[in-house]
């Protein structure tokens, strides 16, 4: 029997996780990948890559929003709030003046590009064409801000 941490159950039952689980050859391989994913950073800063208005690039799973200013805090509550927000937040963009944030997690019909961020999740994995008629893979070329999309090659 699979042990699924509580934090992954929404993913399992609402976001296609069951199909993902079934694609693994063994439970051990699945748990190995979970440990690998848990070891990854919540965001990556590219301070040498800048926009025309001198914002440096930050790539994150979800938008960093208003919690960006607490990313280096040593306060346990701040750390927990930041990590949770960067993994799970939706619709809470914020202009953190020194950065340009590229993120996913929230599915859009088209890339959501503004002067301080770009949401690039166009739901490539999504199978329900009634709810999302045009799921695609999306990439942002930085700092030109050119957007590339590719339809899913899977059925």
Predicted regions and their residues:
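Acidic, His/Gly-enriched loop-helix segments that form or flank divalent-metal centers
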Residues: 2-135, 142-153
């Amino acid at each position: 029997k699979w042990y699924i941490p509580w934090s992954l159950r929404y993913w399992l039952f609402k976001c296609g996780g069951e199909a993902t689980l079934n694609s693994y050859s063994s439970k051990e391989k699945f748990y190995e990948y979970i440990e690998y994913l848990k070891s990854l950073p919540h965001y990556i800063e590219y301070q040498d890559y800048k926009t025309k208005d001198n914002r440096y690039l930050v790539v994150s799973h979800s938008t960093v929003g208003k919690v960006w200013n607490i990313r280096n805090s040593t306060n346990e509550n701040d750390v927990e709030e930041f990590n949770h927000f960067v993994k799970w937040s939706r619709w809470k963009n914020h202009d953190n003046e020194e950065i340009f944030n590229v993120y996913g997690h929230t599915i859009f019909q088209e890339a959501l590009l503004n002067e301080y961020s770009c949401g690039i999740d166009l739901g490539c994995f999504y199978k329900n064409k009634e709810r999302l008629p045009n799921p695609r893979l999306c990439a942002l070329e930085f700092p030109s801000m050119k957007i590339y999309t590719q339809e899913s090659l899977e059925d």
